Amino acid sequence: MNLAWLQGLSLGLLSPPAPALLIFRSFTMAKVLVSDSIDQVGIDILKQVAQVDVKTGLSEAEIIDIVPEYDAIMLRSATKVTEKIIQAGSQLKIIGRAGVGVDNIDVPAATRQGIVVVNSPEGNTIAAAEHALAMMMALARHIPDANKSVKESKWERKQFIGTEVYKKTLGVVGLGKIGSHVAGVAKAMGMKLLAYDPFISQERADQIGCTLVDLDLLFSEADFITLHIPKTPETANLINAETLAKMKPTARIINCSRGGIIDEEALVTAIETAQIGGAALDVFAQEPLGESRLREFSNVILTPHLGASTEEAQVNVAVDVAEQIRDVLLGLPARSAVNIPGLTPDVMEKLRPYLKLAETLGTLVGQLAGGRIDRLTVCLQGDLAEYTNSQPLVVAAIKGLLSQALRERVNYVNAAIEAKERGIRVIETKDASVRDYSGSLHLKATGTMGEHSATGALLSNGEIRITDVDEFPINVPPNNYMLFTLHRDMPGIIGKIGSLLGSFNVNIASMQVGRKIVRGDAIMALSLDDPLPDGLLSEITKVAGIRDAYTVKL
């Protein structure tokens, strides 16, 4: 992939621009606030270009008081960089998270202020993978309880008879970098590998040595289940009473990814009733872990979020993020910006209005497609077809496509690489003959669940409009919560959907129907004020005339 367009920082989105920044540095040393414990090697890198103040344990109010004097903040997981802090940081140019997750940073607020947010997506990969494997082995061989027993001067060999992992089935939920490394080591240990990841191709799974299956089969067949997925609305409480009931009574669950993916109360019930064989958890819905019955069970291992807590990982993430902060303060690109692409000012001026459009359409077709995606086609239409450097738009579309599955792990720098690793073929086409708008984008996602497409354009005031979905003409702005229905164009169907939504207390903000012929197929696009409650989408698909329904979050 040609990354020439990344050689200049997106100064069009930043304030001040590069020349002003360099003049600023000639007279005044930049200042960096380090608000959490960071390895000294990272601080030393920052000191090459800035005055560094290490102030840990500050409250939000305390940070708000001092942040106006800083050009950058470097943090780990303890500090919460809220919208209020960002608004107070009038000089902030970059916020760096020494780790993978950026859920403790208000990224949209930072983006609105033109502040770059960076992370270290690979710095703790090995540490997190090894911790998951260690938890699996500790669970299989009762190591924590056996250790405690011997230290109490006991010798209870029969009580701690374990199980081998050799020839057992490991179910890996999420085959990103961490999940793939876990799978590779487990394969070397002689384990059979099942995996679920809707964004991984079978070819990539074959390279890792996994058999791709659906979640139901994975849950029912696996002896050990390890989770390596971000927390999203779709993955929250993925492990719940219903999914636990599908597992073997000897199944053991390992979660070293994100808290909130497991319904902890349901897990307590499953452990208490011997519905599953055990669990090893490094992350929790609320941290630090408060009152919890999980502490009561000998077959539950708990650690205090140690996935990235190795000397090597702490050095890796500190160096990675400190170097990016240094580079941005010098007017250079950040290699792992999660919110802003690295564009030169002239390219940014032309394409900036369309980046959000491309990302929005990518998010839309990704959610409509649902299953694993094999191909993404991005067509630049009208005036956009004349741009020679259109690569940023393609990357923005990929970022949107993968955003629901990967969240903070996908950014403008790594989006194309993430797509390639998942076996997604990206095709760019151009069609200057389309003149419905001065410039528009058409995206088509093809995968295991079929093919879905969407077209969008910008109004003269810069507002985004979705102009067709699955080749049905519409004209609607994107909304946080949206519902799309494919149905037969017939009297009464709109009223039925409206009544059904109303019965669940879901308010409709706007609605539009697109059709090609009278009484033929049609699509309904509804913007909602509220997310759909559990079970409502299924009820909608039961309405006579409804052929399919999709809920989308934009």
UniProtKB/Swiss-Prot annotation:
Looking up InterPro entries in the UniProt record yields: ACT-like_dom_sf, ACT_dom, ASB_dom_sf, D-2-hydroxyacid_DH, D-isomer_2_OHA_DH_cat_dom, D-isomer_DH_CS, D-isomer_DH_CS1, D-isomer_DH_NAD-bd
Keywords linked to the UniProt accession: Amino-acid biosynthesis, NAD, Oxidoreductase, Serine biosynthesis
**Residue sites binding NAD(+) per the record:** 177-178, 197, 256-258, 282, 305-308
Q: Which residues form the signal peptide?
A: none
EC number(s) per entry? 1.1.1.95, 1.1.1.399
Q: Write down the chemical reaction(s) this protein catalyses.
A: (2R)-3-phosphoglycerate + NAD(+) = 3-phosphooxypyruvate + NADH + H(+); (R)-2-hydroxyglutarate + NAD(+) = 2-oxoglutarate + NADH + H(+)
The record's listing under Pfam families reads: 2-Hacid_dh, 2-Hacid_dh_C, ACT, PGDH_inter
So which domain of life are we looking at? Bacteria
Pathway in which the depicted protein is active: Amino-acid biosynthesis; L-serine biosynthesis; L-serine from 3-phospho-D-glycerate: step 1/3
Q: Provide the top EC class.
A: oxidoreductase
Q: Where is the active site?
A: 258, 287, 305
* Gene Ontology molecular function terms on file: NAD binding; phosphoglycerate dehydrogenase activity
What biological process terms from GO does the record include?
A: L-serine biosynthetic process
ACT domain ranges (all copies): 482-554
Q: What does this protein do?
A: Catalyzes the reversible oxidation of 3-phospho-D-glycerate to 3-phosphonooxypyruvate, the first step of the phosphorylated L-serine biosynthesis pathway. Also catalyzes the reversible oxidation of 2-hydroxyglutarate to 2-oxoglutarate.
The Swiss-Prot or TrEMBL record describes its family as follows: Belongs to the D-isomer specific 2-hydroxyacid dehydrogenase family.
PANTHER family (UniProt xref): D-ISOMER SPECIFIC 2-HYDROXYACID DEHYDROGENASE FAMILY PROTEIN (AFU_ORTHOLOGUE AFUA_6G10090)
NCBIfam families on file = PGDH
The protein in question is named: D-3-phosphoglycerate dehydrogenase
